[in-house]
Amino acid sequence: MSSPPGAYWRAQRLAEVGRYAEAERTARAGLAEAPGDGWLLTLLASVLRLQRDYAGALAGADAAVAATPLLADAHLERAENLIALIRSREAVGAATEAVRLEPEVASGHFVLARALAAGRDFERARAAAAHGRTLDPQSVEGLLTVADVERDAGNREAARVAARAALAVAPDNPYGRWLVAMLDAERLKVRRSMRALREVARDNPGRADLVSMTWPIRGVLSGLRRGLAVSAGLVCALLLVAHWWWAPAGTFARVVAAVLAAVMAGFAARVLIPAGRLPWRCLRLLPSLMRRAGTAGLALTGAAIGLLVAYAATAWWPLPVIALAAAPLLWLLSLAELLGAGLDDPGSREALRSWAGDLRD
């Protein structure tokens, strides 16, 4: 197989320092002279993926595979794009072919592990990552792959250990730092998580993850949605008991409403106060639908908790019923928020388009 041309190395150096637009122009200029060069097509696909043009990147990877079917890097790049496009089964196939072509290269096993994890096949994903690490025990990519697989599988402590090990080798790795910050977020280490996310965004301004930096707001909303449904439902159940069987349950319902409202307010304060102003600043920069759904969810949740407090003070029975009726609306707003995030994310957007095309066919 031929070696990469000079344009490949020039474009790769530009991509390594984050100058993706220049790298893309250099790769395209090289392809103008050698249209079927698999190395350049693979690199172009990689640069487009880093710029979140997943549809264009996949087209480039497909062209690279067609031009040089024995080039393992082309199959790996195709697998990476298929993972981003939420097409895990095809991603596993592409990564498996890359591993077949170059079984001694560790990165192929790591991509295969991520593809398997995307398809929720965690046992095989762990095996693939472990095999890759036997080939390159000090690989930062390998350690971060282990962290990704374990996080997807719900094993946060194992994920944290692997991510920390990766940062011990490469302290400035932006993805490793981001991953540790998000693992801290899942453990409600609010200040530490937000500080780390702020530092990652400062050091990599072109790839700041605004959605991640709003996790305190979104996490509070997620917790309060569940808490409100349970709390209002319990109070309404006690009201029914008081009406039909045991009158003192009405007094107990007021106490429960007050206590649960205080617990939910305390949880919100526990997360939002240490987070500071950064999540609110980032909220304004989110996609329109996601921002509006989140803002409406906050307002509706606050109003519903206020209804529980008002019921505890007045004993007027319609108040908890109205609060309970707000729960389905909150879940609808949650779906709208997810849809807004998906429409902004090129991978999710292309997956939705592909799904719609399948329906039409």
Regions found by a protein language model. Name each.
Residues 285-361:
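Generic detector of multi-pass transmembrane helix bundles and their immediately adjacent loops
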Residues 40-44, 224, 231-235, 260, ...:
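Cleavable Sec-type N-terminal signal peptides
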Residues 150, 184, 192-196, 208-209, ...:
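Alpha-helical transmembrane segments and immediately adjacent membrane-interfacial amphipathic helices
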Residues 224-278:
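Core alpha-helical transmembrane segments of integral membrane proteins
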Residues 188-194, 216-237:
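Alpha-helical linker/edge segments of TPR/alpha-solenoid repeat scaffolds
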Residues 203, 209-225, 268-291, 335-355:
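Cytoplasmic membrane-interface segments at the C-terminal ends of transmembrane helices
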Residues 219, 248-258, 284-291, 318-319:
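Membrane-interfacial entry segments at the cytosolic side of transmembrane helices
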Residues 2-217:
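Alpha-helical protein-protein interaction scaffolds
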